[in-house]
């Protein structure tokens, strides 16, 4: 399986984390932020993460990716759901982008390896 991803993407991290817990090998392909063509060629639009299954079929929803990876062999995500933790995470979603987004392009991440990719990210976030 191949995961098209950004290093700074929390949805990508979710998929990578369950794959690591399972010991499932993923080919991780970091896409530069301004490379919309790679995403569009696979699924017709700009979206990350994209999990390409061994049969070539793409998956777009990170929770579906997590469920698929966890279904291979013995599952590791077997504990009870914790609604109180989910509620805390939901509240954090309101403020986290304001704290993290301005810092991402300052980090030496592969999705920002070119000036054009970094500038593309900054313009997209300013317009959002």
Describe these PLM feature segments.
Residues 1-122:
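GST-like domain detector, emphasizing the conserved glutathione-binding G-site
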Residues 122-128:
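A conserved mid-domain beta-alpha-beta active-site/ligand-binding segment of alpha/beta enzyme cores
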